[in-house]
């Protein structure tokens, strides 16, 4: 199955698993593959979200949440004066997919520690998006209000993290 933009999601999962490996050689190869994948945030960020939504391995989901947060956190400009944040290089459509799918991940995630990491990613994404233009994520505030009103204690916690 190919992820958005052409990543083979099974191969991408193997890269994430290799990042978790105790084998230094395997981990170094995975880090290099991830460095190359970062050149294409249009496919990388949706691939993180896809694994967050569909992968059964909690370690993979956890790592994807952390890597996604780091990807949207890297703000600033490169030496060439280009935006260095992966988020800044996404199309409006890809940004929308990432934003809406991340909110869905909060709802569907069953592991508390992973949900917290997803909330951290949403928080960082929110800081970046809302700093640029508050109207760019109109679903965020209604989602948070609904989560606080939910009868689900996990959603209360997620809204307040």
Q: Model regions: which residues?
A:
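Karyopherin-beta/Importin-beta family HEAT-repeat alpha-solenoid scaffold
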Residues: 1-161
């Amino acid at each position: 199955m190919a992820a958005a933009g052409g990543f083979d999601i099974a191969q991408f999962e193997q890269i994430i698993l290799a990042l978790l490996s105790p084998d230094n050689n395997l981990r170094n190869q995975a880090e290099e593959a991830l460095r190359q994948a970062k050149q294409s945030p249009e496919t990388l960020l949706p691939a993180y979200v896809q694994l967050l939504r569909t992968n059964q391995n909690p370690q993979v989901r956890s790592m994807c949440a952390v890597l996604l947060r780091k990807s949207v956190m890297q703000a600033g400009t490169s030496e060439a004066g280009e935006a260095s944040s992966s988020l800044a290089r996404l199309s409006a459509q890809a940004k929308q997919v990432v934003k809406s799918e991340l909110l869905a991940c909060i709802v569907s995630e069953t592991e508390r520690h992973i949900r917290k990491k997803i909330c951290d990613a949403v928080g960082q994404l929110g800081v970046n998006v809302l700093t640029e233009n508050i109207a760019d994520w109109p679903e965020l505030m209604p989602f948070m209000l609904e989560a606080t009103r939910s009868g689900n204690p996990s959603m209360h916690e997620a809204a307040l993290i």
